[in-house]
From Swiss-Prot:
GO BP terms in the entry: aerobic respiration
Organism this protein belongs to: Nitrobacter hamburgensis (strain DSM 10229 / NCIMB 13809 / X14)
PANTHER family: NADH DEHYDROGENASE SUBUNIT 1 (PTHR11432), NADH-UBIQUINONE OXIDOREDUCTASE CHAIN 1 (PTHR11432:SF3)
Molecular function GO labels: NADH dehydrogenase activity; oxidoreductase activity, acting on NAD(P)H, quinone or similar compound as acceptor; quinone binding
Membrane topology: Multi-pass membrane protein
Principal cellular location given in the protein's record: membrane
EC number(s) reported in the record: 7.1.1.-
The keyword Membrane appears for this protein: yes
Superkingdom of the source species: Bacteria
Stated name of the protein: NADH-quinone oxidoreductase subunit H
Amino acid sequence: MAEFFAAPFWTDFLWPLIVMVAQSVLLLVVLLIAIAYILLADRKIWAAVQIRRGPNVVGPWGLLQSFADLLKFVLKEPIIPSGSNKGVFLLAPLVTCVLALAAWAVIPVNLNWVISDINVGILYIFAISSLSIYGIIMAGWSSNSKYPFLAALRSAAQMVSYEVSIGFVFITVLLCAGSLNLSAIVEAQHVRGLGSLIGLPWLTFLNWYWLPLLPMFVVFYVSALAETNRPPFDLVEAESELVAGFMVEYGSTPYLLFMLGEYVAITTMCAMGAILFMGGWLPPIDLPPFNWVPGVIWFSLKLFFMFFLFAMAKAIVPRYRYDQLMRLGWKVFLPLSLAMVVIVAGVLQFADIAPK
């Protein structure tokens, strides 16, 4: 037995595989529980803006409402439309949900708290968010109905339009941090930035990129809303107008998987906002008692702050028309983000403050 545990097969392959699977399962459980309460927070925030209580029946203060909704969806019978492509129809929500969950493999919630700390973390996130379009197109095409298909095409056009702007946002952060590794980007906001330049390195929040890259932070925030089909850019679903968009033929567990994938993608974008612009797990002030708080708590607070901005946009901003949405993406955000890339690169080069 001792020889087996000392063998290269165990030490180099099997044991790291077991650890990675255990980490993945733990992350999945924590993430799903967090999604349940983020969904509840979304409904509570929306209710508070409209001066009502929101979910308050299931459990104390409605805390178990999301689990009751889960049970309701699971117990319903899935109905597959006649004439639809059954395999693709059932595969589409699974693709959407799995891709959304896969993005969390590279997101660090604290120092060294990440499943796979790859050196191209931003590129991986960008690729995963691009692949999510396939699940939507598969759902629209396989439903054998013109309405889901048209909604899927609208969604694909919308997501592609705003991925360009998000790509330029990533490039800007890459220029400032000098790395595609998400952990390295967070550490760069600890050692370099405005606070360090003015001689106050302990004011960590001045080192974060939200201040020098404020226009790009706004572009990222609005583009993330459009990328995840959130109000005021929920033209694909538009609850009060189009019923359910490309999900109109779905019900039961497949519909639940689509909703789960949507909220996981929203949480991923919130996490990326916290990492790229708010210092990830870093405290706002690198002095006691702030640096006594575990980094995962700071990361969670920043993530929830980003989600609060998402929820407030849903509650107070009216829905855009489709032509307004496309005009904003191609005629405003694309030139602005491209200009910011050039400006940031020029400032870093001529001020000789580019990362070495």
